[in-house]
């Protein structure tokens, strides 16, 4: 008995010592993390505001060479401190998760500074740096108070844009210059029309006078910036936008802990493209026998709502999708609060089809979540209206709602807010996980029977496959453009040939690839999640359920799938096998 008591006491003592060691290591790491985060949002105040950290309200971005150099050095300093962190082996599992997440965030920022050279080679960085909308879209404070912060931003814009000119180094990539010109002019139009309209209800005349003066200066600054880019930078620009294979590998590793070679990812992507084209053709034969797959899709697009019914139909269908999740035990819904289906605000409509606008994870007051759907414009021709509504055909609209809301972005946001994960896990998210999850949900829900069987089921499969083809083409084009020197023209043709887009939207997709190589992550993240699901099901055996998997994935924040594998899978030997 005495020996058993001693053994039990020794175990308790050992556990106590280990726990204290874990706590000491966790505390030391948290001190480094807190120091890093404080400086991080001082340099990126609008990012802090968007997360719901309103202590950064009214602070303005600074792109002076001294500030940028200091931030680059600060990132290196914290990367070195974390690399040399002596107590890492003593970290608890959750702190180790945060450690890895923070290291990735720092390395991603360093990649932007030193590899892609965003502040030297990308004028879009400056053209889109002023997110005035962050103070409009949430009613977390009276509009007059938020307008004061908008005035501060507007007053800062001219000096910011003037300073940015010192940072840009010729030659700049031509696609990024042309897009920056469009963004700057679009921002000027937004400020002059939409922003002025959005704040017109403020009754404080002195404040409104301040706003009008500051806004006029900001409008002029963005117009002048666009003109300067067009006159001074565009003639000297070239087509060297590609990262190159070596930097692309670094990009994958820094952004999402992906170590698979680009060539292997492309091989997987091309095989997936062929498979998905087959699925698209198979569904098309059921939807429109005797017609080509493209003709079948066009036939599907004719089944669309009227302009007046677009929002009500989306709202009604969204509730039926939500109920399907409950009835089929797809995922836990942590809240009864619904996302509000609304028309996309006028000032957000440029380039927007549908979008999910959720509050930041730390927002305590303006907690509304909006599922925005862009309506037809009154001045459009009948042909333009019909084409737009055709894109909102009943089947594609439901697939988009699955992606944006249930169980895509909105449900993932609800899990993030409800989960016990740390501030770090809520601040820094994986592109591949967040977009991969939403895209995964499209196929998963149709696989689980949403839309039924027979002809209706085939129509939903056709719509889902159409969305998948676009995302797979993005993966292939991203690698081909940045590793194989594919041109914008050739990328445009790739989208036309492989996901059957018309020339204009195909070129828009190709242009996006020049500045957003990460748009490969929609498909890559989806494929990683499908692999993780298979491995998790094999591990759990009779204890597996789809709901259990989805809850486990979403309750770990928004981490790269590589880290999720460590959290969910017991067998360490398979952690690196993400695809």
Q: What would you call each of these model-derived segments?
A:
Residues 1-5:
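Positively charged n-region of N-terminal signal peptides that target proteins for export
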């Amino acid at each position: 008995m005495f020996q058993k008591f001693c053994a039990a006491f020794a175990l308790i003592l050992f556990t106590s010592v280990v726990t204290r060691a874990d706590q000491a290591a966790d505390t030391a790491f948290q001190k480094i993390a807190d120091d890093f985060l404080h400086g991080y949002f001082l340099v990126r105040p609008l990012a802090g505001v968007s997360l719901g950290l309103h202590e950064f309200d009214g602070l303005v971005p600074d792109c002076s060479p001294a500030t940028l150099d200091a931030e680059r050095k600060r990132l290196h300093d914290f990367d070195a401190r974390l690399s040399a962190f002596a107590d890492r082996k003593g970290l608890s599992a959750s702190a180790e998760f945060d450690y890895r997440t923070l290291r990735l965030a720092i390395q991603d920022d360093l990649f932007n500074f030193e590899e892609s050279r965003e502040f030297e080679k990308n004028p879009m960085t400056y053209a889109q740096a002023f997110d005035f909308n962050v103070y409009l879209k949430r009613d977390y404070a009276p509009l007059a108070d938020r307008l004061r912060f908008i005035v501060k931003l507007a007053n800062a814009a001219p000096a910011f844009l003037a300073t940015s000119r010192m940072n840009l180094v010729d030659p700049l990539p031509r696609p990024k210059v042309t897009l920056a010109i469009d963004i700057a002019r679009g921002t000027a139009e937004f400020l002059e029309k939409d922003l002025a309209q959005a704040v017109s209800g403020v009754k404080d005349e002195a404040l409104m006078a301040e706003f009008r003066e500051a806004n006029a200066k900001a409008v002029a600054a963005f117009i002048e910036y666009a003109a300067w880019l067009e006159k001074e930078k565009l003639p000297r620009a070239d087509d060297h936008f590609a990262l190159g294979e070596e930097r692309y590998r670094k990009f994958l590793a820094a952004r999402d802990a992906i170590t698979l070679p680009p060539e292997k990812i492309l091989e997987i992507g091309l095989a997936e493209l062929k498979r998905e084209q087959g699925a698209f053709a198979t569904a098309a034969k059921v939807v429109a026998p005797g017609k080509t797959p493209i003709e079948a899709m066009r036939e599907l697009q004719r089944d669309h709502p009227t302009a007046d019914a677009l929002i009500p139909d989306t709202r009604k269908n969204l509730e039926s999708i939500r109920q399907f999740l409950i009835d089929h035990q797809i995922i836990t819904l942590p809240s009864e609060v619904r996302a509000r289906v609304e028309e996309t605000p006028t000032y957000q409509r440029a380039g927007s089809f549908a979008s999910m606008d959720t509050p930041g994870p730390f927002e305590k007051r303006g907690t509304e979540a909006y599922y925005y759907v862009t309506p037809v414009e009154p001045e459009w021709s009948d042909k333009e209206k019909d084409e737009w509504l055709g894109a909102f055909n009943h089947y594609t609209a439901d697939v988009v709602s699955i992606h944006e809301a249930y169980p895509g972005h909105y449900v993932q946001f609800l899990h993030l807010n409800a989960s016990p994960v740390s501030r770090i896990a809520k601040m820094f998210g994986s592109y591949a996980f967040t977009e991969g999850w939403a895209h995964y949900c499209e196929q998963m829900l149709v696989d689980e029977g949403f839309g039924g069987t027979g002809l209706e089921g085939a129509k939903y499969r056709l719509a889902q496959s159409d969305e998948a083809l676009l995302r797979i083409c993005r993966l292939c084009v991203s690698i081909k453009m940045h590793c194989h020197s594919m041109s914008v023209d050739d990328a445009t043709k790739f989208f036309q040939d492989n996901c059957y887009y018309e020339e204009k939207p195909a070129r828009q997709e190709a242009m996006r690839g020049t500045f957003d190589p990460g748009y490969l992550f929609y498909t890559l993240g989806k494929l990683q999640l499908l692999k993780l699901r298979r491995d998790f099901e094999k591990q759990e055996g009779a204890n597996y359920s789809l709901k259990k998997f989805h809850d486990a994935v979403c309750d770990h924040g928004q981490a790269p799938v590589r880290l999720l594998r460590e959290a969910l899978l017991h067998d360490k030997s398979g952690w690196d096998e993400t695809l």
